[in-house]
Amino acid sequence: MAQVQYYGTGRRKHSVARVRLIPGEGKIVVNGRDLDEYFGLETLKLIVKQPLVETGVTGQYDVHVNVNGGGFTGQAGAIRHGIARALLQVDPDNRATLKAAGFLTRDARMKERKKYGLKAARRAPQFSKR
């Protein structure tokens, strides 16, 4: 018999996360590695787990994630977004909870481009009066 799986795609900065929720005991696997092994910082682990904690389903689903692009912070945000979207498939009643917490909103903030004549996006070259 086929096992029930719920899918969600999350994005943040330049990171894209493809998330699968499978009924299980709460293991989170990111790119074939355990969550604790993949993310060193505790804050990033908390960010990833937020939607599960908010909806009260911690320990009920195994989470399998493929994430690529961006850095660790962007990847953690993308995973959070993907898990939230997958939890909507699990139970549409979760929408109000997830929406209020802001987990369903794609964070549109991106790195500002560097402009010519400047050293960075807004950093101007040092000014010399004389």
From Swiss-Prot:
One of its GO terms (cellular component) is cytosolic small ribosomal subunit. One of its GO terms (biological process) is translation. The keyword Ribosomal protein applies. Coiled coil: none annotated. Keywords: Ribonucleoprotein, Ribosomal protein. SUPFAM superfamilies: Ribosomal protein S5 domain 2-like. One of its GO terms (molecular function) is structural constituent of ribosome. The keyword Disulfide bond does not apply. Pfam families: Ribosomal_S9. PROSITE patterns: RIBOSOMAL_S9 (PS00360). PANTHER family: RIBOSOMAL PROTEIN S9, SMALL RIBOSOMAL SUBUNIT PROTEIN US9M. Belongs to the universal ribosomal protein uS9 family. This is Small ribosomal subunit protein uS9. The lineage of its organism: Bacteria, Bacillati, Bacillota, Bacilli, Bacillales. The gene is rpsI.
